[in-house]
């Protein structure tokens, strides 16, 4: 059996991975995301970021055979512009104000790297999310909880911001941060039977 390593510090990703895998390791990637410039193709961009995270971790464990490293990156896009994690409360407020009464996309790139053979597979998932119309009071109250500060697009669907979501088209777990259905298929492609 292959040793599975998640290249992420995200507690949300760790919790989600536990739903399909009982045994895995966590090694946090030190990959510099700014080393990959965005060039208008969001799906390629998130897959390249996921690969960078997986390769960064694989370099730390080169002497160990039988490892598969999972890299993942999730981002929010609105009007073909990437909304990363907010810099401060004002930035979070402005992001949420822009998303109010609008549809946006959540992209996750996945990369699974077999450390021994250097074989890698990459894919992505895109989910459309529509927010209801939010008042300034709702946005400010949510921003003041601190919840949006470590999340792409300044919200977490699994938390208090879940009430902002009018509808979703696609994988819910993608919006949380780890598209389980796609990951499951990719792991099976790499020989992991779940």
UniProtKB/Swiss-Prot annotation:
Keyword hit for Hydrolase: yes
Any idea of its EC number? Answer: 3.6.1.9
Q: Which reaction does it catalyse?
A: dTTP + H2O = dTMP + diphosphate + H(+); UTP + H2O = UMP + diphosphate + H(+)
Keywords (A to Z) from UniProt: Cytoplasm, Hydrolase, Nucleotide metabolism
Q: Which cofactor does it need?
A: a divalent metal cation
The active-site annotation reads: 73 (proton acceptor)
Q: Can the keyword Cytoplasm be found in this entry's annotation?
A: yes
- One Gene Ontology term, aspect cellular component: cytoplasm
Question: What Gene Ontology molecular function terms does this protein carry?
Answer: dTTP diphosphatase activity; UTP diphosphatase activity
Primary location class: cytoplasm
Query: Which top-level group of life is the source organism from?
Result: Bacteria
Enumerate the subcellular locations listed in this protein's record, separating them with semicolons: Cytoplasm
Site entry (Important for substrate specificity), positions: 12, 74, 158
GO BP: nucleotide metabolic process
Membrane-spanning ranges:
none
| Job description of the protein | Nucleoside triphosphate pyrophosphatase that hydrolyzes dTTP and UTP. May have a dual role in cell division arrest and in preventing the incorporation of modified nucleotides into cellular nucleic acids.
The family line of this record is: Belongs to the Maf family. YhdE subfamily.
Name the NCBIfam families on file: maf, PRK00078.1
Q: What is this protein called?
A: dTTP/UTP pyrophosphatase
Record the organism. Clostridium botulinum (strain Langeland / NCTC 10281 / Type F)
């Amino acid at each position: 059996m292959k040793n599975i390593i998640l290249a992420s510090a995200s507690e949300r990703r760790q919790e989600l991975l536990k739903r399909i895998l009982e045994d895995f390791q966590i090694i946090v990637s030190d990959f510099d995301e700014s080393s990959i410039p965005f060039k208008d193709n969001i799906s390629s961009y998130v897959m390249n970021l996921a690969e960078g995270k997986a390769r960064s971790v694989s370099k730390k464990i080169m002497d160990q055979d039988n490892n598969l490293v999972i890299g993942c990156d999730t981002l929010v896009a609105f009007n073909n512009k990437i909304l990363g994690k907010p810099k401060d409360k004002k930035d979070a407020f402005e992001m949420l104000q822009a998303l109010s009464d609008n549809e946006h996309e959540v992209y996750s790139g996945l990369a699974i790297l077999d450390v021994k053979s250097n074989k890698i597979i990459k894919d992505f998932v895109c989910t459309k999310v529509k927010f209801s119309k939010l008042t300034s009071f709702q946005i400010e109250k949510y921003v003041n909880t601190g919840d949006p500060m470590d999340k792409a697009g300044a919200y977490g669907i699994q938390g208090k911001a879940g009430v902002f979501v009018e509808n979703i088209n696609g994988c819910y777990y993608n919006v949380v941060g780890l598209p389980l259905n796609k990951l499951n298929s990719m792991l099976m492609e790499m020989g992991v039977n779940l």
